[in-house]
A protein has these predicted regions:
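Generic structural signal for well-ordered alpha-helices
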Residues: 15-19, 42, 46-53, 85, ...
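Catalytic alpha/beta core domains of metabolic enzymes, predominantly
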Residues: 96, 101-163
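Active-site mouth loops of central-metabolism enzymes
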Residues: 1-15, 67-79, 125-136
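Glycine-rich, proline-tolerant flexible connector loops at the mouths of alpha/beta enzymes
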Residues: 28-52, 99
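Glycine/small-residue-rich loop that forms an oxyanion/phosphate-binding "nest" at active or ligand-binding sites
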Residues: 61-99, 103
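Alpha-helix-loop-beta-strand connector modules within alpha/beta enzyme cores
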Residues: 42-68, 111-124
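Hydrophobic faces of well-ordered beta-strands that scaffold small-molecule active sites
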Residues: 1-6, 27-31, 61-65, 95-99, ...
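Active-site-proximal loop/turn and secondary-structure-junction residues that shape catalytic pockets
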Residues: 8-10, 33-37, 65-69, 101-103, ...
Length: 163
């Protein structure tokens, strides 16, 4: 599966990236809104999400506002992040919404309520770019993601050796 992240910060950069999607022929697109210079403005962010949705056509779109503590491109307020998630879910502009496991069960349940009755799926993610956690931690993290309500459990780690 090929996933192409769109990481432009301005509308022009984002649309330029979106215009190149057909030549790459990905299976899915990840909209990295934590790169957007206007991310704190929900109306502008929703308008941009609509434009990308239109440009993506039938390709599935993941809406991701990665926390800076897990590799996000900049600090984004929770208010802006979850307001965008709420509005994007209302309009069914995306196919997946990605929320970090660190937000905990209450916030994850809130996102599940946002997408209830829609065809949007929840990705619950965990990232460790310093190391690969021990096998037991990998399995317990994935289990926690599933218990929290993930439709897709995602764990990304940095390999440091061949083991």
């Amino acid at each position: 599966m090929v996933c192409i992240p769109l990481v432009g910060s301005s509308r022009e950069e984002i649309m330029r990236e979106a215009a190149g999607i057909p030549s790459i022929a990905p299976d899915i697109i990840e909209l990295r809104v934590d790169a957007w210079e206007f991310i704190e403005d929900t109306a502008a962010s929703i308008a941009m999400t609509r434009e990308v949705r239109e440009a993506a056509g039938e390709l599935p779109v993941i809406l991701t506002c990665r926390g800076h503590w897990e590799g996000g491109l900049k600090k984004v307020s929770d208010e802006a992040k979850f307001s965008l998630y709420r509005e994007a879910a209302k309009e069914a502009l995306v196919d997946f919404i990605d929320v970090e496991l660190v937000y905990g069960d209450e916030k994850i349940r809130e996102v599940l309520a946002m997408i209830a009755g829609s065809e949007i799926h929840l990705i619950v993610s965990f990232h460790d770019f310093e190391k690969t956690p021990p096998k037991e931690v990998v399995f317990s993290t994935l289990a926690a993601q599933i218990r929290a309500g993930a439709h897709v459990a995602k764990l990304a780690a940095m390999p440091r050796c061949e083991e």
